[in-house]
């Protein structure tokens, strides 16, 4: 069986008290790999990145499945599950099915959920013409980017209160999945075995 710990942290802008807060961009993740690999590490450190950025895929990934930096430091980008082979530039939320990602939850009387770029046209208007996404760069029929309600990725109802954000933050989604929220009671985690397979291979090194 695998024996490892995950570093749990929140984004810097998180309001959760007592949590470790880190701004973990792709660039910073790569820098951390280089830094930790420069000195011997007493235990294996594994850095895992989304697969939605070409330069990061090259820096942190490898055709063998993971990159060996030396001094017990390893990295890999998340492998692409079978249901995402047509759109391989993915982040961790894409491990879930589209239906699971789009599950609605009620927060303070507002129905919120994660949206995907292909639900909107290239100017940010939803297919049914009811909603608007302010992040046009994430929108379009060929895009599956996660639209999660952060300040620059708000979704609002065109005919309603434009101040009400309908998109669900990634961390709220993750907390509810982890907390066995009833809305996500039947969520499918099977794709995550791909990640644990790579961790297992690294642990066996």
Model-predicted regions and their roles:
Residues 38-40, 85, 89, 185-188, ...:
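Active-site-proximal structural scaffolding
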Residues 143-205:
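Nucleic-acid enzyme cleavage-core boundary/entry regions
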Residues 42-164:
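Activity-critical C-terminal alpha-helical subdomain
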Residues 10, 78-80, 140, 168, ...:
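Intrinsic-disorder/low-complexity coil detector
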Residues 1-63:
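Conserved helicase/translocase motor-coupling segment
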Residues 5-10, 75-77, 96, 116, ...:
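Compositionally biased, intrinsically disordered low-complexity regions enriched in proline and serine
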Residues 39, 99-103, 184, 202-205:
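Short secondary-structure junctions and interdomain/linker hinges
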Residues 27, 90, 99, 190-193:
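Generic alpha-helical secondary structure signal
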């Amino acid at each position: 069986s695998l024996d490892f710990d995950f570093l749990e942290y929140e984004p810097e802008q998180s309001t959760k008290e007592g949590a470790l807060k880190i701004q973990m961009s792709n660039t910073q993740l790569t820098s951390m790999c280089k830094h930790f690999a420069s000195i011997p590490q007493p235990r294996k450190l594994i850095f895992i990145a989304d697969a939605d950025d070409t330069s990061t895929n090259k820096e942190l990934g490898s055709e063998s499945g993971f990159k060996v930096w030396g001094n017990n430091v390893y990295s890999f980008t998340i492998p692409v599950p079978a249901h995402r082979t047509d759109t391989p530039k993915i982040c961790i939320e894409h491990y879930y099915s589209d239906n699971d990602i789009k599950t609605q939850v009620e927060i303070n009387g507002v129905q919120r959920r994660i949206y995907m770029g292909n639900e909107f046209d290239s100017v940010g208007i939803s297919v049914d013409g009811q909603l608007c996404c302010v992040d046009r760069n994430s929108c379009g029929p060929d895009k599956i980017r996660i639209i999660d309600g952060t300040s620059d990725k708000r979704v609002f109802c065109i005919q309603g209160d434009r101040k009400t954000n309908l998109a669900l933050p990634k961390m709220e989604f993750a907390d509810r999945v982890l907390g066995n929220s009833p809305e996500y009671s039947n969520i499918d985690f099977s794709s995550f075995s791909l990640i644990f397979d790579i961790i297992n291979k690294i642990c066996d090194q």
